[in-house]
């Protein structure tokens, strides 16, 4: 509990000074954001707030964040919120570090699918929902408006350097959100466990072309199955008893476990249909 308070220390250790805090307008006064700002200031660093994250990010909303990062000479990123905030932070980090036409890094066949050239600037993820697991993945999902299609940018270098998993940030989530996001966690675990096995896929021409999602494998299976068991044990109490902090803490941990699982193995039918 309370690990959000360490975010400023982490950025100072990483030699960052201009820190872009990416969140949405509904979280500006939430404890997760106020603690993040305070911690950065206490470490004599410069917090720069960007609160224009879209609930469902689009290429346009990503471009706003990218322009903001470039204009403000950002050298450290922290995504505070759900998957939308964290994915927006990944995109802002990528394109401000390696500027390119927007479609360059977008997954083929919609985009060019060009591999990320190298390391990005330090990014820390602070999740405030018990759902997406974006703090563990190298994927930034968005709606491509021109085609009315959901796609993503996916590469291992997009993974946040640090995830601060703080139960205090999920204590006030409405029960219906805990329920819906909890089913997302369940799908992450089940889909990654039943994904096409890694050994049935063709070897890429070079390691740089290896996809972010490898298929089910013995290591991701451990994380995925553990997450499913944690959801089964805790989701009822997390939804129906908001004061059951242990149940909500376990759901938040399950999110991260499932994220490590599907962040390596990938998802399939449910997420593909959505």
Regions found by a protein language model. Name each.
Residues 98-212:
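A glycine/threonine-rich phosphate-anchoring loop and its flanking beta-alpha core
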Residues 20-21, 76-78, 124:
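Conserved beta-strand elements of the Class I
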Residues 8, 37, 48, 63-66, ...:
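Predominant activation on well-ordered alpha-helical scaffold segments within soluble catalytic domains
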Residues 1-14:
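N-terminal amphipathic/basic leader segments beginning at the initiator methionine
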Residues 198-274:
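Active-site segments that bind and position negatively charged phosphate/pyrophosphate groups
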